[in-house]
């Protein structure tokens, strides 16, 4: 299928009610969140392949990069009102058109 890869997925917890309550505030929080995640991805050697809604899909060549990225995001958002869920998955996947596919995903 493809080489073994590591994937990090993120999602902001409770974002829909926040959008309903205050769109301007949520837009600012989301922009901050996106900067934090993208900075952590760059530092950890990952590749963003998905940004649906308020979450990210990021590919890494090894689990060390994915864990480092997740910890970097957590550390940067410690004082932030947003709670971000993150999951890491490892398995075979193939890359096509700047995205990944296969049973792992």
Language-model features, listed with the residues they occupy:
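Charged, alpha-helix-enriched surfaces in structured cytosolic catalytic cores
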Residues: 65, 83, 102-103
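A short glycine-enriched loop-to-beta-strand structural element that forms part of the catalytic core
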Residues: 82-96
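A residue-level structural signature of the nucleotidyltransferase/glycosyltransferase Rossmann-like core
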Residues: 7, 85, 99-100
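Catalytic-core segments of nucleotide cyclases and related cyclic-nucleotide turnover enzymes
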Residues: 96-105
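A common structural junction motif
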Residues: 76-82
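Catalytic NTP-binding/metal-coordinating core of nucleotidyl cyclase/transferase enzymes
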Residues: 1-69, 76
């Amino acid at each position: 299928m493809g080489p073994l890869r590591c994937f990090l997925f993120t999602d902001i917890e409770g974002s829909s009610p926040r959008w309903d309550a205050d769109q301007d505030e949520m837009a600012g929080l989301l922009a901050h969140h996106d900067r934090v995640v993208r900075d952590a991805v760059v530092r950890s050697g990952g590749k963003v392949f998905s940004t649906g809604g308020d979450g990210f899909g990021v590919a890494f060549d090894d689990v060390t990069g994915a864990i480092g990225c997740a910890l970097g995001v957590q550390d940067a958002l410690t004082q932030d009102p947003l709670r971000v869920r993150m999951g890491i998955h490892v398995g075979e996947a193939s890359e096509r058109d700047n995205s990944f596919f296969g049973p792992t995903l």
